[in-house]
Amino acid sequence: MNLTIGFGSTPQEVSIPDNLVIGILKANEAEICLTGVDEIKRSLENPIGTTRLRDIVKPGEKVVIITSDITRPVPSYKIIPSILDEIYEAGVNKEDIAVVLALGSHRVHTDEEKIKLLGERVYNEVKCIDSDANDCVRMGETKSGTPVDIFRVVAEADRRICVGNIEYHYFAGYSGGAK
């Protein structure tokens, strides 16, 4: 039996002798009305438990959109343009918006990688920067005395919008979320 399975970024062909195949499990069909950018826009237009983003941000405010770096499979190039449109509808100027790629302990991005992550429109329209552990503001300490340092651009913003994913992590259990 020949099968095509997803592996990495491209499908892989595998051949399994018929006598070794016990069966094939298939997922139930899911009803999907919208996908991709259409679903992102619908979600921004109909938020759960809050008002629309365009009703939260105000003209003159500094807005930072924080997203994952190149090591995470977040489709920021699909998500952030719709977020920008929502922010622009609120009257926020492009000059007051920055996209921060949260590096953690990872290396900085090349300009080409930033374009791949964010798309040309976002990269050319607003400030797109990597977080910098050497440019932080001390916000305080935890109860156990651990310093809480936040990247200056994020700390000084009036509004912070976080975009990310939650996925299995090979030694931490899960990655993303409130990390």
Predicted ranges, named:
Residues 14, 23-25, 74-75, 163, ...:
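Short helix/loop capping segments that flank catalytic or ligand/cofactor-binding pockets
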Residues 48-64, 89-95:
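Glycine-rich phosphate/diphosphate-binding loops that line cofactor/substrate pockets in enzymes
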Residues 73-92:
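Histidine-anchored nucleotide/phosphate-binding helix
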Residues 96-106, 131-135:
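Short, glycine/charge-rich beta-strand/loop segments that flank catalytic centers
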